[in-house]
Amino acid sequence: MEKTFAIIKPDAFAAGNAGKILARIYQEGFTVIGLKKLCMSQREAEGFYAVHNKKPFFAELTKFMSSGPCIVMVLEAEGCIGKWRDLMGATNPADAKPGSLRREFGTIVGENATHGSDAPETAAVELEYFFSGLELL
């Protein structure tokens, strides 16, 4: 069974949508095998998004991701990465298909409610940033 890493971002949490997003995750057939509510420090956000450290949006992204609580998760399902990315929708909520999480709960590109790994290798690195193997059920 494939795994992926997911985040319910601070904007969705602040808007009171974390529970609605979690409900959709379960409704769509994902199994949550790891879940933590946390507030990333600026340093933790910079470490997690280090792959983007030379990009112009890096400072804004890490400031936003350390601006409030979020939920980090490890999801499991058949074809999990593609299935989760499809449920999230396009990065820009305005371009996301109706019914997708980003269309429903996101507002702008930088505050688009959710994050998801884009490949198995990325998922492995990202989930290990927040979870040890002993924490995944």
Swiss-Prot record:
<dbReference type="GO" id="GO:0006228">
    <property type="term" value="P:UTP biosynthetic process"/>
</dbReference>
<feature type="binding site">
    <location>
        <position position="112"/>
    </location>
    <ligand>
        <name>ATP</name>
    </ligand>
</feature>
<dbReference type="InterPro" id="IPR023005">
    <property type="entry name" value="Nucleoside_diP_kinase_AS"/>
</dbReference>
<keyword id="KW-0418">Kinase</keyword>
<dbReference type="GO" id="GO:0005737">
    <property type="term" value="C:cytoplasm"/>
</dbReference>
<protein>
    <recommendedName>
        <fullName>Nucleoside diphosphate kinase</fullName>
        <ecNumber>2.7.4.6</ecNumber>
    </recommendedName>
</protein>
<keyword id="KW-0597">Phosphoprotein</keyword>
<dbReference type="GO" id="GO:0005524">
    <property type="term" value="F:ATP binding"/>
</dbReference>
<dbReference type="GO" id="GO:0006183">
    <property type="term" value="P:GTP biosynthetic process"/>
</dbReference>
<feature type="binding site">
    <location>
        <position position="102"/>
    </location>
    <ligand>
        <name>ATP</name>
    </ligand>
</feature>
<keyword id="KW-0808">Transferase</keyword>
<keyword id="KW-0460">Magnesium</keyword>
<comment type="subunit">
    <text>Homotetramer.</text>
</comment>
<keyword id="KW-0067">ATP-binding</keyword>
<dbReference type="GO" id="GO:0006241">
    <property type="term" value="P:CTP biosynthetic process"/>
</dbReference>
<comment type="function">
    <text>Major role in the synthesis of nucleoside triphosphates other than ATP. The ATP gamma phosphate is transferred to the NDP beta phosphate via a ping-pong mechanism, using a phosphorylated active-site intermediate.</text>
</comment>
<keyword id="KW-0963">Cytoplasm</keyword>
<feature type="binding site">
    <location>
        <position position="85"/>
    </location>
    <ligand>
        <name>ATP</name>
    </ligand>
</feature>
<feature type="binding site">
    <location>
        <position position="9"/>
    </location>
    <ligand>
        <name>ATP</name>
    </ligand>
</feature>
<feature type="binding site">
    <location>
        <position position="57"/>
    </location>
    <ligand>
        <name>ATP</name>
    </ligand>
</feature>
<dbReference type="Pfam" id="PF00334">
    <property type="entry name" value="NDK"/>
</dbReference>
<feature type="active site" description="Pros-phosphohistidine intermediate">
    <location>
        <position position="115"/>
    </location>
</feature>
<keyword id="KW-0546">Nucleotide metabolism</keyword>
<dbReference type="GO" id="GO:0046872">
    <property type="term" value="F:metal ion binding"/>
</dbReference>
<keyword id="KW-0547">Nucleotide-binding</keyword>
<dbReference type="InterPro" id="IPR034907">
    <property type="entry name" value="NDK-like_dom"/>
</dbReference>
<keyword id="KW-0479">Metal-binding</keyword>
<feature type="binding site">
    <location>
        <position position="91"/>
    </location>
    <ligand>
        <name>ATP</name>
    </ligand>
</feature>
<dbReference type="InterPro" id="IPR001564">
    <property type="entry name" value="Nucleoside_diP_kinase"/>
</dbReference>
<dbReference type="GO" id="GO:0004550">
    <property type="term" value="F:nucleoside diphosphate kinase activity"/>
</dbReference>
<dbReference type="InterPro" id="IPR036850">
    <property type="entry name" value="NDK-like_dom_sf"/>
</dbReference>
<comment type="similarity">
    <text>Belongs to the NDK family.</text>
</comment>
